[in-house]
Amino acid sequence: MPDSDNESGGPSNAGEYASAREQDRFLPIANVSRIMKRALPANAKISKDAKETVQECVSEFISFITGEASDKCQREKRKTINGDDLLWAMTTLGFEDYIDPLKLYLHKFRELEGEKAIGAAGSGGGGAASSGGSGSGSGSHHHQDASRNNGGYGMYGGGGGMIMMMGQPMYGSPPASSAGYAQPPPPHHHHHQMVMGGKGAYGHGGGGGGGPSPSSGYGRQDRL
């Protein structure tokens, strides 16, 4: 007796696979449902077919707008689609009523991204400042020892806010001092310490705004 479709993995499994591939084109339905519920009273319900309808419409809208923006980038020999390209595409396709609020949103989004980047850079500089401050007390003693011995040298300040205290191990007889004073014999072991701090170590803030990272390419889907 021939196997059924379910047993042989025939049309039934193929249909399920095709349905899964079709769902890959859409936004996750849980996200769509969550957005829809924000516009409804707390006790409102949304049917499954309503969620699926909005899911398909939103996904097609995204493909429609992105495809138009992609054409613009190709004409201008660019590989990265940015927010301004999408706003241009919406205006071209007749969605100009949505442009003003979206421009405000895009401007605010870029401001927040810039503030996040500055805050991250500031927190990193503050950590370097605290570590530099804790090491400066003990480091000053090491620097004094290094200054009294040949081969040791110290650096303070500098444009990048670097504090360096370094001594080199001594081998053989020490060279004569430039001042002509007798030098003590070199120790067998010499301290070697570096304290690195960014500009934040001296109270200077640093940071930079970051724009959206460019994607390596873009795809174009068929539009309705």
Curated annotation (Swiss-Prot):
Cellular component terms per the entry's GO annotation: CCAAT-binding factor complex; nucleus
UniProt cross-references to CDD domains, sorted A to Z: HFD_NFYB (cd22907)
One Pfam short name: CBFD_NFYB_HMF
Region (Disordered): 1-22, 121-152, 173-224
Keyword tags: DNA-binding, Nucleus, Transcription, Transcription regulation
Annotated spans, Subunit association domain (SAD): 54-65
DNA-binding region positions on the chain: 27-33
Compositional bias annotation for Gly residues: 121-138, 197-212
Taxonomy, superkingdom: Eukaryota
Signal peptide feature range: none
Biased amino acid composition, Low complexity: 213-224
Gene3D superfamilies documented for this protein: Histone, subunit A
One GO MF term attached to the UniProt entry: DNA-binding transcription factor activity, RNA polymerase II-specific
GO biological process: regulation of transcription by RNA polymerase II
Compartments, record wording: Nucleus
Main location: nucleus
Record's subunit section: Heterotrimeric transcription factor composed of three components, NF-YA, NF-YB and NF-YC. NF-YB and NF-YC must interact and dimerize for NF-YA association and DNA binding. Interacts with NFYC2, NFYC4 and NFYC6.
Function statement: Component of the NF-Y/HAP transcription factor complex.
Family: Belongs to the NFYB/HAP3 subunit family.
Protein name: Nuclear transcription factor Y subunit B-10
Originating organism: Oryza sativa subsp. japonica
Gene name tied to this protein: NFYB10
